Amino acid sequence: MTVIDEQEALKRRLAELKTEHRDLDIAIDALINSGNYNNLQLQRLKKRKLVLKDYIFLTENALLPDIIA
């Protein structure tokens, strides 16, 4: 796999992560607005959303070139 292929794979993965993060945000809002949820269910969704945020951060950093100042 070339560097360009790796970059493209990272970009695709980043798009997938952002989509899943956005979908979880919508799901959490819908769950809260429904008023019919338990706290454990909500906590699991929020934890998953935080994990995705970390993966997004790591993937974005992997896409940035290393610049030595």
Q: Across the structure, where does each feature detected by a protein language model lie?
A:
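Amphipathic, hydrophobic secondary-structure cores in small proteins
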Residues: 8-69
